[in-house]
A protein has these predicted regions:
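Extracytoplasmic mature domains of secreted or surface-exposed proteins
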Residues: 1-9, 16-22
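Glycine/charge-rich, flexible interdomain linkers and switch-proximal surface loops
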Residues: 62-77, 126-139
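Generic secondary-structure signature for well-ordered alpha-helical cores
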Residues: 54-58, 119, 139
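Short, low-complexity, polybasic intrinsically disordered segments
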Residues: 92-103, 141-151
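Compact, glycine-rich, soluble single-domain proteins
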Residues: 28-74, 81, 85-99, 106-113
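Short, conserved loop-to-beta-strand elements that form functional interface hotspots
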Residues: 108-137
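Flexible glycine-/small-residue-rich
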Residues: 13, 35-37, 81-82, 138, ...
C-alpha cells in the first residue's frame, strides 16, 4: 500500500497495447493498493483488512504527524489484484516468476468482496482487472509504503 498524490492503471491486451474494453482508472490523493489474496482469506478477514486500510492514519497533519486516514481526507483508492507469485532466481541469472498454487476464482471473488468492503466506508474505489497485464503509474507521496498482513 502506497500513499499517492495520483495513480492510474490501464489494462493491456495480448499485443501489449491498451485494451479498448477497459477504461483507464485514475485517482488523485489517496492509496494505491497491491492486494494479494491468500487461499484461507474469508469474509471476516476481508472486512478486517478493509477496515485497516480505511482507518490507517497515514496522511499528513501539522508538524509532520500522521493523524488522518484515507476516509478523513476524503481520498480515493486504486486497488490492484496481485496474484501470489514467487521469483525463482537460478545461478543462470534468468529469473522466472512462478505462480503459487491458488484458486483464481476464490482470489478474484475475494478481491471483489474486499473492494466492496472498502466502498462501504464511503471511499471511492477504482480497480484493475484480475489476471490481466496492467500498466500502473503513480506519483508517490512519501516515501511511504505500508504492508498490512491479516495475521
Amino acid at each position: 500500500m502506497q500513499r499517492v498524490n495520483e495513480a492510474s492503471i490501464a489494462v493491456l491486451n495480448d499485443l501489449g497495447t491498451l485494451d479498448p474494453t477497459f477504461d483507464v482508472q485514475q485517482i488523485g490523493l489517496g492509496l494505491l493498493l497491491t492486494v494479494e489474496i491468500e487461499p484461507d482469506d474469508d469474509e471476516p478477514t476481508i472486512d478486517m483488512m478493509a477496515n485497516r486500510v480505511l482507518t490507517l492514519r497515514c496522511f499528513d497533519g501539522p508538524q509532520g504527524s500522521l493523524p488522518q486516514s484515507v476516509q478523513e481526507i476524503r481520498g480515493e483508492v486504486l486497488s490492484i489484484p496481485q496474484p501470489l507469485t514467487s521469483l525463482h532466481s537460478p545461478a543462470t541469472g534468468r529469473p522466472q516468476l512462478v505462480a503459487e498454487d491458488t484458486d483464481d476464482e476464490h482470489a478474484n471473488l475475494t478481491w471483489i468482496r474486499f473492494n466492496e468492503a472498502l466502498r462501504s466506508g464511503n471511499v471511492p474505489v477504482y480497480e484493475g482487472r484480475y489476471g490481466a497485464r496492467m500498466r500502473i503509474g503513480s506519483i508517490v507521496d512519501g516515501p511511504f509504503q505500508f504492508t498490512l498482513i491479516s495475521d
